Amino acid sequence: MKGINGAKRVRHDASPSAQDGYVTPEKRVKRWSGGQTAANYREWDVEEVCLFLASHGLGELEVIFRENKIKGRILEYLTDSHLKDLQISSVALRLDLLSCLRMLCQNSPSIMKVFNDPIHGHIELHPLLVRIIDTPEFQRLRYIKQLGGSYYVFPGASHNRFEHSIGVGYLAGCLVQALHERQPDLQIDMRDMLCVQIAGLCHDLGHGPFSHMFDGRFMPLACPQKKFKHESASVAMFDHLIQSNGLEEAMKENGLCLPDDLTFIKEQIAGPLSSEAEQQFNSSPNSSSWPYRGRTEEKSFLYEIVANKRNGIDVDKWDYFARDCHHLGIQNNFDYKRFLKFARVCEVGSKKHICTRDKEVGNLYDMFHTRNCLHRRAYQHKVGNIIETMITDAFVKADPHIKIEGANGKYYSISGSVDDMVAYTKLTDNIYHQILYSNDPNLKEAREILQKVERRHLYKYIGQTHPHSNSRIEPDKYDKLPADLASSVPQTSAKDVELHAEDFIVDVIHMDYGMKEQNPINNVRFYCKADPRKAIKIRRDQVSQLLPEKFAEQIIRVYCKKTDEKSLETAKRYFIQWCMNKDFSKPQDGDVVAPDMTPLKASWVDDDDDEDNEGKQQTELLHKSRVKLFTN
């Protein structure tokens, strides 16, 4: 008599051979060993998969698995919806099978590659991610500084986009895995997990030399008509990486479905891919329409892991907070591991969003405050910024004379290389030293600027001011600011010193909490312990009275290219006169630099008195509160 798996059943009698587990050769049954073969379950053929099913009491599924030719490499990607499609109607049977498959995948010896990261410790990455890392396009990130010119101010800031990208890929896996384990009903499958990790790994492939200096300073000057964004370049570089290294087949072997999963990965990096959908999404990110094609609205939360366009809470920030603080020597006050413990998905309207516990709202405000502190103390450091400005000047002057070979033997300039990924792969921070050590007479001006950077002969900082919120300077006016400043000649300036527009650099900086003037917490949803399924909104006044009233400001810094003492003294008076003319805030050293000028503006004189009066009122109020507290 045969069992359900078609094999002869073993006799269950009291004979010594049966009790001892010994079966005569003619009675032996081929069994799944559960030992050595389990380590290589991805290499199983259909029959070996069926033996595994039979050994776990799931032999009735053998026919289905044989008919659909399901091999070992598919097992870890099977989900409940897949089993339904296979006409497995019994819920209990599906759950038993998924439980067995989960144990198989977890208990088999790991095929992951281990990296020892200074921030996250020993981390494991999927072999497909390692295949992506081991390509020239990804290795290029080893030669692009994470913080650009900040390395010239902070000696420890020598880290590169390479290690940051690996960290983001790892954290993306941590978050999606946490959601999968906490909420199996979300039906996050292995395809989803792998795509999210790949998106995290590849999100910065498109960065140019010195990272944000390239897209924030150089490209707007060298090629303003291109509207270059490193996210779009990351998508183009990702396509080039996959095609030039023949990774499509490796992706399919690991269970990905092309081209849908490629679309999903690219959408996580750069947002909606079609221009119409992107424009609609940028104008109204909370719109009810669904702009993505890689995943349905049912899995909308997956788009909030790598680059969260909704509120800015994503694994990219988590890694650069920890990594940048480590290398800068600045304290990091945000603990992403705590966020992982409380993250869960809740429905908000027709979409599903990643939410956190209501008690975590204060920590999220601290997270955005940490971001603001990093910008003030490091990313927008006045010396780091002027060094990047000088490097940008050198690159702009060198741009027409640098030739980088691209596809089909065509050559491109620095700014033109973004149109050809073969050329762009060769463009890294090394271009700095290529210019610095060049003997080309066409690069003389650029070379001299970089030599000044090397000798620390920098453009001199003149001062800083703030425009009022109702008089913000628009980007299309930036080019006119140096000329406007040069025309603000103070009456008491030195007659033998004349300054022109080309002598000034005016740097306009935007500081915010990541979403311009908006409070990003307004776009975060929380849940409470009483009902974890219900998403709620928490207003700022429900948290604390000490939180910021405004979430964005504009800072204007002025530098002078002339470095002699007389020119600098005159430049500072020009600057103060310009601030008076434009009704900007009084420079911090205004009373010291030009004590004869600042009293001429009434609002500047009254500022101190107003602040003193306000301080007295606050002190009196605090005193009354204490009296009331101790007399009750």
Curated annotation (Swiss-Prot):
GO terms for molecular function: deoxynucleoside triphosphate hydrolase activity; dGTP binding; dGTPase activity; GTP binding; nucleic acid binding; RNA binding; single-stranded DNA binding; triphosphoric monoester hydrolase activity. DGTP 1 binds at Q146, L147, R161, K317, Y320, D324, R371, Y379, Q380. It is found in: Nucleus; Chromosome. Residues 1-22 are annotated as: Disordered. DCTP binds at Q146, R161, H207, H212, K317, Y320, D324, R371, Q380. It catalyses: a 2'-deoxyribonucleoside 5'-triphosphate + H2O = a 2'-deoxyribonucleoside + triphosphate + H(+); dATP + H2O = 2'-deoxyadenosine + triphosphate + H(+); dCTP + H2O = 2'-deoxycytidine + triphosphate + H(+); dGTP + H2O = 2'-deoxyguanosine + triphosphate + H(+). Allosterically activated and regulated via the combined actions of GTP and dNTPs (dATP, dGTP, dTTP and dCTP): Allosteric site 1 binds GTP, while allosteric site 2 binds dNTP. Allosteric activation promotes the formation of highly active homotetramers. The keyword Calcium does not apply. Protein that acts both as a host restriction factor involved in defense response to virus and as a regulator of DNA end resection at stalled replication forks. Has deoxynucleoside triphosphate (dNTPase) activity, which is required to restrict infection by viruses: dNTPase activity reduces cellular dNTP levels to levels too low for retroviral reverse transcription to occur, blocking early-stage virus replication in dendritic and other myeloid cells. Belongs to the SAMHD1 family. Homodimer; in absence of GTP and dNTP. Homotetramer; in GTP- and dNTP-bound form. Interacts with rbbp8/CtIP. This is Deoxynucleoside triphosphate triphosphohydrolase SAMHD1.
